[in-house]
UniProtKB/Swiss-Prot annotation:
It comes from Mus musculus (Mouse). Residues 54-60 are annotated as: Complementarity-determining-2. CDD domains: IgV_L_kappa (cd04980). Residues 1-23 are annotated as: Framework-1. GO terms for cellular component: immunoglobulin complex. PROSITE patterns: IG_LIKE. The keyword Oxidoreductase does not apply. This is Ig kappa chain V-III region PC 3741/TEPC 111. The lineage of its organism: Eukaryota, Metazoa, Chordata, Craniata, Vertebrata. Residues 102-111 are annotated as: Framework-4. The PC 3741 and TEPC 111 sequences are identical. Pfam families: V-set (PF07686).
Length: 111
């Protein structure tokens, strides 16, 4: 199975500042010219919400404050600027190889 390692596990950012979350895969998640890495936001009591698909594509309805980058094994989710509503846990997920796997999550808090 592909192991996804997120860092940091938790992050405290001031309102209006930038939050950066990293995800490293144990092997490449690239195929056919695409990176099959996705980012989700989860708030307590709610299902995960897709933010970014295939590394850098913004899901419909998601603010452009969210962006994703990376390829092969190293990926980044950036939130800039951070707003109060962004308090949540963020997960990376790969869909290049079965079983699809998630990172351990990064909890974002406001400083």
């Amino acid at each position: 199975d592909i192991v996804l390692t997120q860092s940091p596990a938790s992050l405290a950012v001031s309102l209006g500042q930038r939050a950066t979350i990293s995800c490293r895969a144990s092997e490449s998640v690239d195929s056919y010219g695409n990176s099959f890495m996705h980012w989700y936001q989860q708030k307590p009591g709610q299902p995960p919400k897709l933010l970014i698909y295939r590394a850098s594509n913004l899901e419909s309805g998601i603010p452009a404050r969210f962006s994703g980058s990376g390829s092969r094994t190293d990926f980044t989710l950036t939130i800039n600027p951070v707003e109060a509503d962004d308090v949540a846990t963020y997960y990376c997920q790969q869909s290049n190889e079965d079983p699809y796997t998630f990172g351990g999550g990064t909890k974002l808090e406001i400083k």
